[in-house]
């Protein structure tokens, strides 16, 4: 899963940061202007809410990527999926999603999918397929802000699972409530679903 990467970054930040005396002598950077500040969690945002995911028919691009280019890779995958839907005259039946099927410290395998109202009639094109989204018991979390800032959300999710002694299945799903193709990255709103055993 993505969580080992987070721990690596935390350790690097702790041990590679400025020394205590250097930190005292430095002036903190000014806060970003309000228009550039990342959206904050809002009252009522889900955090560990138990839900039941229903399987949906999706058209998806399957691939792998490294974490450094994760968002850009997913945006390109969604462009391919939406292009195929347009050619087939199909309509989306919900927000786009990424299903992470394997992760490690350097990268991940994914299915970047869009739910559809009906299955495609003809061939989709190279690298695209039709399948079902995950179903069953899951925990729902909300992330607001850039994709790069998601490590803090995943850290909170890991802590929540540990505290509740819950075991996650070997995948997780992100639903993009804001369009990842057109929304400024700092304004993303993403539902994270963690299927649990």
Which residues does each PLM region occupy?
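A solvent-exposed interaction/effector surface
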Residues: 2-197
């Amino acid at each position: 899963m993505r969580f080992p990467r987070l721990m690596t970054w935390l350790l690097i930040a702790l041990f590679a940061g400025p020394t205590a005396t250097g930190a005292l002598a430095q002036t903190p950077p000014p806060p970003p202007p309000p228009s550039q500040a990342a959206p904050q969690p809002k009252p009522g945002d889900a955090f560990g809410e138990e839900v039941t995911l229903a399987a949906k028919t999706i058209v998806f691009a399957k691939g792998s990527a490294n974490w450094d280019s994760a968002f850009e890779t997913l945006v390109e995958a969604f462009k391919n999926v939406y292009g195929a839907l347009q050619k087939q005259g199909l309509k989306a039946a919900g927000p786009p999603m990424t299903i992470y099927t394997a992760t490690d410290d350097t990268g991940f395998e994914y299915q970047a999918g869009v739910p559809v109202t009906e299955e495609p009639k003809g061939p989709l094109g190279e690298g695209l397929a039709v399948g079902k989204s995950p179903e069953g018991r899951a925990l729902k979390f909300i992330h607001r802000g850039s994709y790069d800032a998601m490590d803090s959300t995943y850290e909170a999710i890991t802590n929540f699972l540990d505290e509740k002694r819950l075991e996650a299945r070997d995948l997780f799903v992100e639903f993009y409530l804001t369009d990842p193709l057109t929304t400024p990255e700092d304004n993303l709103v993403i539902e994270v679903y963690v299927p649990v055993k």
